[in-house]
C-alpha cells in the first residue's frame, strides 16, 4: 500500500480560484450567452512588451544555430540577467544586493512555497489575515499546521489581522515567531507599508532571530515615492529577509513564466543544536537539485525588460493597469461602496454592502452584473465582508463592468 501525504487532506474544500471557476462555470451553463467580465484572478490581458518579444524571437533564432544553441543553463539563472536585476531593481535604490544573491525561477508563487524546503518543521509561522492563500496552503501541505477550525484558521499558525482600523498593515506579533510572510503592495487589500512600518518588522525579526518572507510581486505599481519598493531599502534587512519578485504583472509574464528570489549571503538560520547555517547555501543546493532553471529564451525576454525600450514599455503597461484601478475606485465610490487599495497596487478591496457575506456578494455581482470578483473570505476569516477586484483587464471591459455595477447599486 502506498501512503499519501495526509497533510493534503487538511486543506479546505478547494483552492480559492478553482472554487470561483466552479461557480462561474455553473453560472455559464445556465446562462451561456451572458457577457461575463472577469475581474477576479489577477491575470494580465495586455500583450508582452515589444522589447521582450523581439528579444525572445532573437533567442529562438539562436536556438536554431549550432554555434549559438543553448542547452541546460545555470540553475541560478544566467549571470547577464541577474546582473541587470541587481543593478536596476536593487543597487539603483541603494540596496546592497549582488547578482550572486539572485535566483531566477519560473514564478514567485512557486518560490514562496518551495522556500519551505530549507526550513525546519518546528518554526512558529505568522501570516496576515486576509492573506494570499498560497502562503497558508503550502505550510499545511508541509505539515506545519494542525486542522482548520470553522473559520478556516489552521492550528499552529499565528494570524495577524489586517483591517481598515490598522490600515491593512499588521501589528507586530505579541509572541515570538520564526517565519513571517509579508506582501507589499498587499494582495488582496492593495495596501502599502511605510518605511517606518517595515523598519519595525525588520527590528522585530532581528530581535527574535526570525526570517521575513517579503513578497514584492507588485512593487512596480507603487506610485508614492515615499513607499519602499524592496525590503532591502530598510537598514538591517539583509540580516533577516528573503525577497520574492516576479515579471508576471509588470511585464505581462503570467504565461511566459519568470521571477526571482533574493537570498542575501550571510543570512542565517540555525540547526536544532543551535549551529548557524547560511540560507543562501541551502537554497542554492535545493535549486540545483530540484530545478533545472528557466529557459534561455524566457530569460532573454526578461533581460529586455531592463533595456531603455523595455523600461518605457513596462511603465506604459503599469500606467494602463493603474488607470483601470483608478476607474474602478472612482465608480465604486460613486456607487456608494467603501473602497480601499487601487492607488499603489492593481487591486481594489471593497466592503460588501449591508453586511452581506463575501460569497453572497460574489454571487450577486455575478448574477446581477455578470462581473466576477474574488470573495474576501477566500483570503482568510478577516476578509469576510470584502471582495477584491483586479485592474488586470482591457479598458473597455473595466468601463463596462463598472457601468453595470453603478447601475445595479448606485
Curated annotation (Swiss-Prot):
Pathway(s) annotated for this protein in UniProt: Amino-acid biosynthesis; L-lysine biosynthesis via DAP pathway; LL-2,6-diaminopimelate from (S)-tetrahydrodipicolinate (aminotransferase route): step 1/1
Catalytic activity: (2S,6S)-2,6-diaminopimelate + 2-oxoglutarate = (S)-2,3,4,5-tetrahydrodipicolinate + L-glutamate + H2O + H(+)
Keyword Plastid belongs to the record: no
Protein name, as recorded: LL-diaminopimelate aminotransferase
Positions where N6-(pyridoxal phosphate)lysine occurs in the chain: 249
Gene name tied to this protein: dapL
Cofactor section: pyridoxal 5'-phosphate
The entry's keywords: Aminotransferase, Pyridoxal phosphate, Transferase
Family of the protein in this entry: Belongs to the class-I pyridoxal-phosphate-dependent aminotransferase family. LL-diaminopimelate aminotransferase subfamily.
Subunit structure, interactors included: Homodimer.
EC code(s) of this entry: 2.6.1.83
GO MF term set: L,L-diaminopimelate aminotransferase activity; pyridoxal phosphate binding
Natural source organism: Thermosynechococcus vestitus (strain NIES-2133 / IAM M-273 / BP-1)
Record: residues binding substrate: 15, 42, 109, 132, 187, 292, 388
InterPro entries attached to this UniProt entry: Aminotransferase_I/II_large, DapL/ALD1, PyrdxlP-dep_Trfase, PyrdxlP-dep_Trfase_major, PyrdxlP-dep_Trfase_small
GO annotation terms (biological process): lysine biosynthetic process via diaminopimelate, diaminopimelate-aminotransferase pathway
Role, per record: Involved in the synthesis of meso-diaminopimelate (m-DAP or DL-DAP), required for both lysine and peptidoglycan biosynthesis. Catalyzes the direct conversion of tetrahydrodipicolinate to LL-diaminopimelate.
Chain sites annotated for binding pyridoxal 5'-phosphate: 72, 108-109, 132, 187, 218, 246-248, 257, 292
Amino acid at each position: 500500500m502506498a501512503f499519501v501525504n495526509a497533510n493534503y487532506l487538511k486543506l479546505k474544500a478547494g483552492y480559492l480560484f478553482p472554487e470561483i471557476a466552479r461557480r462561474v462555470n455553473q453560472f455559464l451553463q445556465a446562462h451561456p450567452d451572458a457577457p461575463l467580465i472577469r475581474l477576479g484572478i489577477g491575470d494580465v490581458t495586455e500583450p508582452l512588451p515589444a522589447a521582450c518579444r523581439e528579444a525572445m524571437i532573437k533567442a529562438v533564432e539562436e536556438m536554431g544555430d549550432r554555434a549559438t544553441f543553448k542547452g541546460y543553463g545555470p540553475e541560478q539563472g544566467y549571470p547577464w540577467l541577474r546582473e541587470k536585476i541587481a543593478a536596476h531593481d536593487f543597487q539603483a535604490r541603494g540596496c546592497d544586493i549582488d547578482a550572486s544573491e539572485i535566483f531566477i525561477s519560473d514564478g514567485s508563487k512557486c518560490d514562496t512555497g518551495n522556500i519551505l524546503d530549507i526550513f525546519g518543521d518546528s518554526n512558529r509561522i505568522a501570516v496576515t489575515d486576509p492573506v494570499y492563500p498560497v502562503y497558508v496552503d503550502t505550510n499545511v501541505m508541509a505539515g506545519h499546521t494542525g486542522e482548520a477550525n470553522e473559520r478556516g484558521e489552521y492550528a499552529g499558525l499565528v494570524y495577524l489581522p489586517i483591517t481598515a482600523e490598522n490600515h491593512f498593515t499588521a501589528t507586530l506579533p505579541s509572541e515570538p515567531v520564526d517565519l513571517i510572510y509579508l506582501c507589499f503592495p498587499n494582495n488582496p487589500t492593495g495596501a502599502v507599508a511605510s518605511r517606518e512600518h517595515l523598519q519595525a518588522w525588520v527590528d522585530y525579526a532581528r530581535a527574535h532571530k526570525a526570517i521575513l518572507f517579503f513578497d514584492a510581486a507588485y512593487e512596480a505599481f507603487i506610485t508614492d515615492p515615499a513607499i519602499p519598493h524592496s525590503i532591502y531599502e530598510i537598514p538591517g534587512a539583509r540580516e533577516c529577509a528573503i525577497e520574492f519578485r516576479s515579471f508576471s504583472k509588470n511585464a505581462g509574464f503570467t504565461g511566459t513564466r519568470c521571477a526571482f528570489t533574493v537570498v542575501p549571503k550571510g543570512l542565517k538560520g540555525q540547526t536544532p543544536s543551535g549551529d548557524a547555517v547560511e540560507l543562501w547555501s541551502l537554497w542554492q543546493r535545493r535549486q540545483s537539485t530540484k530545478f533545472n532553471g528557466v529557459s534561455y529564451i524566457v530569460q532573454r525576454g526578461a533581460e529586455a525588460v531592463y533595456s531603455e525600450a523595455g523600461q518605457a514599455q513596462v511603465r506604459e503597461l503599469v500606467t494602463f493597469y493603474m488607470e483601470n484601478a483608478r476607474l474602478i475606485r472612482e465608480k465604486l465610490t460613486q456607487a456608494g461602496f467603501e473602497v480601499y487599495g487601487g492607488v499603489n497596487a492593481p487591486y481594489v478591496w471593497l466592503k460588501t454592502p449591508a453586511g452581506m457575506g463575501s460569497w453572497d456578494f460574489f454571487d450577486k455581482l455575478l448574477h446581477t452584473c455578470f462581473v466576477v470578483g474574488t470573495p474576501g473570505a477566500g483570503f482568510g476569516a478577516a476578509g469576510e465582508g470584502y471582495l477584491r477586484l483586479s485592474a488586470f483587464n482591457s479598458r473597455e471591459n473595466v468601463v463596462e463592468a463598472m457601468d453595470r455595477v453603478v447601475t445595479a447599486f448606485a
